[in-house]
Curated annotation (Swiss-Prot):
Underlying gene: DTHD1
Coiled-coil segments: none
Name of protein: Death domain-containing protein 1
GO aspect biological process, one term: signal transduction
Domain Death: 679-764
């Protein structure tokens, strides 16, 4: 759990100092503000005032002594304000930093008095870390700086002087893939010379490791780095990140999450949610940052912080007026900071869990899940009373609204799939009735006890739908269950664990669609079940559609990664070049995870018995433990797929017609007059036969079907050539001394063409050559 803290403020004001007794002999007085880096790895800034004296002729020790004894009419005032909000458990502290810019005024050496003028700029710095650090204050010291240090520092500082007022805003673009165009990654407001050194990249492949429990990613994940590692960035700089939040409510808030290279995170509260930024018309989360790293915008549970003093506190939650807390006087021995989060429970989830297991039947309803944080070093001296809403039965109206897939004000999500909704409805909607055995049960989570436990006799009913809870010890989170009859504590703990897991999960499915104009292009999406119909309509408008049907429904958590493996005779590529890879989809509820791929067959001669190529997309869940983070490329996934796939999608690809480029046909004409006559007669006969006659003749002649198919394939558009080919093939298959004319005449009579048989006999006997309609190239034997 991380804190959002307001930046600490450190101000320094330095009044002008007038050197009254220094003669104007070309001396130059410079008062400079320098930043010295601390040792031991701690980040702290010290403001050093350095008085430099430079004489044109010489600098003597006597002059230094004279100047030190000079009465200065002025003073240096330093004020520091620091507010530290800290949990002893979390050990989250704030470091104060101060960066001051200097201005050097040229002094005329011809005048007798020299005035040094310093202009200081106050800045604010806040840094929240995961490890405890000692708070370091800003101090002012006076020291001597060697000539070497001056020569190396002054050019840098002069550059800062030159550009300190040249604040600009730059739009950073990045290209996610070869298919999509560039999109806005962020806007950075900083001095122009700094903007030239900053680089911004979109690293959405890291989102699995960025998002946490009860968080929903609503923007790209970006990383901002400085190309010149030795360049000092004048923090703070402004960053605006575009985001799109579809679901907002009283219980959720928009925060900017900042992670370092080790994925240690902190949160920043946006100072504005702008509707317009440059050419981008969407919404941007604007923050001031004091370090570079990995940035993202997340929707998380809203945190409410308040301080409980020795006098106690009575507070009504701003998120839900039905929830209030009463800390009696003396509950703590000293003031402590308390943080509260409220997570509403969807009645449909309770109904679904009851339908899944009969042991949960006694659960009628629940209160919201309360996350509360107290310092463990301050135990309760007196019981703390909380008032929570807890309806005595599941609200039929609330359940109906979830059926219609409408977003509740609490920003909960309908995760009930249509396949089991009927059973859920029957198991959940019952008439409310009074039962003497009805009871209320409090279940709390204590980290030191490693889990949930049941607490007895701490819940009381105030009025219908409202209960009071007395806490005698620290609980990280708790929930009140309204039971129709008593249940064993082990069953209650199992129910709460299942409910907590269901609140972190969403029912979703995989949608696979082919582009209608180009079946080799597919779109693969992970879609929440409640959005399925709308997504299918949108795909249809984009020109995608067709089989297969969406996959079966499964449970997936925010940021969970799905591995898509192509098997069978079809593989895919994201750029049309590299085929045979596996691809990943990262599920984010408020974003639209989508892959557009090019597919083709592995073996063009495969699936020969089918009119299309066949393959399968096998989908696996990838646990976070198997993901190796890498900023520069996609996440490396360990190849141990011991678990079963969550779903499979059949993939089909129509076979394309093969264009065979054949050379021009040539016929060998024999010089033997008998063979030449036979060839002429067979060609004449092929021209005289119709398609029906040819089919009948081919069936009567002793020819194999494969031979006829091969002849048709060679000449698909010329019937005469087909008939001539199989007649020649039949003639060659006969023995040499066979009476071919008599056999052919017999087959012609069988198909009812006795006229052609008689004319064939006449032409053979009289050696009549018929002029062919098509000329052939003659190849020498």
């Amino acid at each position: 759990m991380h804190d959002e803290c307001t930046p600490q403020q450190t101000m320094s004001s330095i009044q002008d100092t007038k050197a009254a007794d220094i003669a104007a002999r070309g001396e130059l007085n410079v008062i400079e503000t320098a930043t010295v880096s601390p040792t031991n790895g701690e980040e702290s800034h010290y403001t050093n005032q350095v008085q430099l004296e430079k004489n044109k002729t010489h600098m003597s020790s006597a002059l230094v002594e004279k100047e030190n004894n000079t009465s200065l009419n002025g003073r240096v005032l330093g004020q520091e304000e620091s507010q530290n909000k800290m949990f002893p458990d979390n050990a989250e502290n704030e470091d104060d930093k101060q960066i001051e810019h200097m201005t050097v005024e040229n002094i005329n050496g011809n005048r007798e008095e020299t005035h040094g003028i310093i202009q200081t700029t106050e800045t604010e710095i806040q840094e929240t870390s995961e490890s405890p650090r000692e708070e370091m204050t800003t101090s002012s010291i006076i020291c001597d700086i060697s000539k070497k240090y001056i020569n190396s520092t002054l050019p840098n500082d002069s550059e800062n002087i030159k550009h300190k007022n040249n604040i600009m805003e730059k739009e950073y673009l990045d290209v996610l893939s070869d298919v999509t165009g560039p999109q806005v990654s962020c806007y950075i407001t900083a001095p122009s010379y700094v903007l030239q050194q900053l680089e911004c990249r979109i690293i959405n492949h890291m989102s699995s490791l960025i998002v946490g429990d009860n968080e929903e990613l609503v923007s790209n994940v970006i990383t901002i780095e400085c190309s010149d590692k030795e360049k000092r960035v004048p923090f703070p700089i402004g960053i605006a990140i575009p985001f799109t939040a579809r679901y907002r409510g009283n219980y959720r808030d928009i925060m900017v999450k900042v992670c370092d290279i080790n994925l240690q995170s902190s949160y920043l509260n946006p100072n504005s949610l702008e509707g317009m930024k440059g050419g981008y018309k969407g919404t941007c989360a604007s923050v001031k940052v004091y370090k570079l790293g990995i940035f993202s915008v997340v929707s998380c549970l809203k945190k409410e912080s308040f301080t409980v003093t020795k006098k106690g506190l009575a507070l009504k939650s701003s998120m839900d007026s039905r929830i209030s807390l009463n800390y009696p006087p003396g509950v703590f021995t000293s003031p402590v900071l308390v943080q509260l989060k409220i997570q509403p429970v969807d009645p449909a989830l309770v109904a679904h869990l009851k339908a899944q297991q009969d042991t949960f039947y006694s659960v009628q309803s629940t209160s919201p899940l309360i996350h509360i944080q107290h310092p463990s070093t301050y135990p309760f001296q007196k019981p703390v009373t909380l008032f929570l809403p807890c309806s005595p039965y599941l609200d039929k109206n609330n359940l109906g609204s979830e059926i219609d897939h409408k977003r509740r004000a609490s920003a909960t999500i309908n995760r009930i799939t249509p396949s089991y909704f009927n059973r859920t409805k029957i198991a959940s909607i019952r008439k409310p009735r009074k039962n003497a055995s009805e009871c209320l049960k409090l279940l709390g989570f204590r980290s030191q006890d490693s889990g949930w436990c049941g607490l007895d006799d701490v819940v009381k009913t105030i009025q219908s739908g409202l209960v009071s809870v007395e806490l005698y010890e620290h609980l990280e989170r708790f929930i009140v269950l309204h039971l129709s009859s008593t249940m064993d504590n082990s069953h209650l703990v199992t129910f709460v664990k299942s409910l907590e897991e269901a609140m972190l999960s969403t029912t979703a499915c995989i949608v696979l669609s082919h582009q209608k104009d180009n079946p080799h292009r597919i779109a693969v999406l992970v879609v929440p079940s409640k959005d399925l119909s709308q997504v299918l309509k949108d795909l249809h408008l984009e020109g995608f559609g067709g089989p297969p049907e969406p996959s079966r429904h499964f449970q997936v958590r925010e940021g969970e990664q799905l591995l898509l493996r192509f098997t069978g005779n079809i593989f895919a590529s994201s750029n049309g070049k590299d085929y045979g890879k596996d691809y990943t989809l990262i599920f984010h509820l408020q974003r639209k995870p989508r892959l557009e791929l090019q597919i083709k067959e592995v073996d063009e001669f495969g699936n020969y018995s089918c009119p299309h190529y066949k393959g399968t997309i096998v989908v696996y869940k990838v646990p976070k433990g198997k993901i190796v983070p890498n900023l520069n490329q996609s996440l490396v996934i360990n190849e141990n797929h011991s678990q079963l796939p969550i779903c499979k999608l059949p993939l089909k690809l129509p076979k394309h017609k093969k264009l065979i480029n054949r050379p021009q046909s040539t016929k060998r004409v024999s010089k033997d007059p008998v063979e030449a006559l036979w060839d002429n007669l067979l060609h004449w006969l092929a021209e005289e036969l119709s398609e029906e006659n040819a089919e009948s003749l081919s069936s009567t002649l002793p020819l194999r079907r494969s031979t006829i198919q091969l002849i048709k394939l060679k000449n698909p558009d010329d019937l005469t050539e087909q008939i001539h080919e199989f007649l020649c093939f039949w003639k060659k298959s006969l023995p040499t001394f066979t009476d071919k004319l008599r056999l052919l005449a017999r087959h012609l009579r069988k198909i009812g063409r006795s006229d052609l048989a008689e004319e064939l006999k006449f032409k053979w006997e009289n050696k009549v050559f018929t002029e062919p309609q098509q000329c052939f190239d003659v190849a020498p034997e």
